[in-house]
Amino acid sequence: MKLFLNSNLLRNSIFFKISAFVLISVACFFLGKHWSEDGFRRLIFFSAEPSRSPIVALSPDFGKTYNISGLIYESHPILPPSLSPPPPPDSVELKVFGIVNENGTMSDEFQIGDYDVESAETLGNQTEFESSDDDDIKSTTARVSVRKFEICSENMTEYIPCLDNVEAIKRLNSTARGERFERNCPNDGMGLNCTVPIPQGYRSPIPWPRSRDEVWFNNVPHTKLVEDKGGQNWIYKENDKFKFPGGGTQFIHGADQYLDQISQMIPDISFGNHTRVVLDIGCGVASFGAYLMSRNVLTMSIAPKDVHENQIQFALERGVPAMVAAFTTRRLLYPSQAFDLVHCSRCRINWTRDDGILLLEVNRMLRAGGYFVWAAQPVYKHEKALEEQWEEMLNLTTRLCWVLVKKEGYIAIWQKPVNNTCYLSRGAGVSPPLCNSEDDPDNVWYVDLKACITRIEENGYGANLAPWPARLLTPPDRLQTIQIDSYIARKELFVAESKYWKEIISNYVNALHWKQIGLRNVLDMRAGFGGFAAALAELKVDCWVLNVIPVSGPNTLPVIYDRGLLGVMHDWCEPFDTYPRTYDLLHAAGLFSIERKRCNMTTMMLEMDRILRPGGRVYIRDTINVTSELQEIGNAMRWHTSLRETAEGPHSSYRVLLCEKRFESSEKRRTKKRRKTKGKRA
């Protein structure tokens, strides 16, 4: 019995001890919770706020690690935890705009004309922007607003930067060989920083084909050519227009009759079939080229800037392909074997000077088997001095292995050989020599003339062409000589480019009515194989295209000419050799994303504005970032702009920037500029 009582007492004692321990533990638990809610958030045994970072348990063998900062008491009060997630931070307004420089780093040092500091900090978030003709600053597509560019002075309506650089021309060591007619571009930072004004009374150009025969006087307000050449049936003024009867110095009865005579002399010339691309040297007002267009012939008409006042400007206003260019000390910007026929009618060039170096340049550009047509006084006059010039010309052409195939009246026609056999059979020491095999006859950018005969390709490349129009879509042999990465798939690339642009141009013709908007003079600023121009020709859009091959890419000019198209080499970091208001359409596909590494995009856009006619259009296909930045610049030039998706859809990294240089805006700017000038004088 006693043992039983002792056992019960022991059990009761253990029970009480356990109960007391539990009560003390519960009391400590609630006491700790009370302290935690009073602000001791660093108590590691309890926290009402869930842990924000994961807890990692380490092996005891690794060593014990303590979060010391978690044990430090902070005297400042801690706010109680929020029952709802904290609101997102206010959006930060971006106040700095930058571009990626050539080193690949972001920089905020850039220039897009003059800008308003306050407006530059106002951001637009719209997806498409259309510019306004008002002078007020408006927000643009992306990140910054740009103040409108100023208008250049009134005396710059016909300014060509690289040909009107008076200070550079004054510094030339010599001008005996026409150096003043060559490119003498402004130094970096000295180019255009304003938009070129239009002449007073400027009107929308007369559409083709009427423009072949008449243009508005106020668009090219110069009468000197009428005074000098009116008696030669070139040009005359009637009321508010210039009229072009179609004559020339050596074909006063009209270009059509003159062309018929050439065709009768050499039937194999076959205009529009065998002969597709022609060079007219010293072109006057380009009636020769204008009348060849009706025979499916493209003629590049060239002349220096001031031999006859504004002759190239008249040609371009008529809607005829033309460029300001001269035979001086450098190669012309066209490839070897480019032209099926070269024409010179009283072009005022001494072909025999310096042992015929200028005729050697013609020989470089003339296609193997092509024709040189010379209409000049030495051909038919019997004065002693002129007869000597004729004999010198015969001697030179014989040494060039040209064959005089026909001489009739005032016209003489030579034919270039189709291979090098004649050159190699000449006697030792006969000049001019053949160029060495290392010479690249297609290298033309700032390259001096060479006193040697350009070799003809032994494999017949450049000479074996399909007749027009089959040659337009036939991959030419010289496609294999272009310095590009692909070798085997070149023809496939050629065909793919043609199909690509035909599909796009078909959409433009149907949706944007390209056949109805009066496109005539077109410039493709990065032409590739010429697929854009070929598509326009194939779809019968009544225009001509000058295909520009940038110096920064592969030289595809030989392919351009072998297709029966026109092209030229150019560096878009420099101004283009043409008058203001030359083109109805400027097309640039992938140009700016490449050239922005070398060139100032604002300078390029100002040059585009200079050569674009009022009412003209610009189509830029490039990356999203590039087109957004260009849209801002276009707005600053008062272009009407809109950014569109490509056919690839909204997720494509490319966009199409459509721009229009509205005539009303140009006229409004000119009027406002004149008012400001008068106000300053008053």
From Swiss-Prot:
**Residue ranges, Cytoplasmic compartment?**
1-11
Q: What class of enzyme is it?
A: transferase
InterPro entries, per the entry: Put_SAM_MeTrfase (IPR004159), SAM-dependent_MTases_sf (IPR029063)
Q: Please verify whether the record's keywords include NADP.
A: no
Q: Which UniProt keywords apply?
A: Glycoprotein, Golgi apparatus, Membrane, Methyltransferase, Signal-anchor, Transferase, Transmembrane, Transmembrane helix
State the membrane topology: Single-pass type II membrane protein
Transmembrane parts of this sequence: 12-32
Q: Which domain of life is it from?
A: Eukaryota
Pfam families the UniProt entry points to: Methyltransf_29
Q: Which BP terms does GO give this entry?
A: methylation
Look up keyword Kinase and say if it applies: no
Compartments (UniProt record): Golgi apparatus membrane
- Those parts of the protein on the Lumenal side are 33-682
Molecular function (GO) terms for this protein are: methyltransferase activity
Main localization, broad class: Golgi
Annotated glycan sites: 67, 103, 125, 155, 173, 193, 273, 350, 395, 419, 600, 625
E.C. number(s) listed in UniProt:
2.1.1.-
The Gene Ontology CC terms held by the record are: Golgi membrane
Q: Which family does it belong to?
A: Belongs to the methyltransferase superfamily.
* Cited PANTHER family: METHYLTRANSFERASE PMT12-RELATED, SAM-DEPENDENT METHYLTRANSFERASE
Q: What is this protein called?
A: Probable methyltransferase PMT12
Organism equals Arabidopsis thaliana (Mouse-ear cress)
Task: Identify the taxonomic lineage of the organism of origin.
Answer: Eukaryota, Viridiplantae, Streptophyta, Embryophyta, Tracheophyta
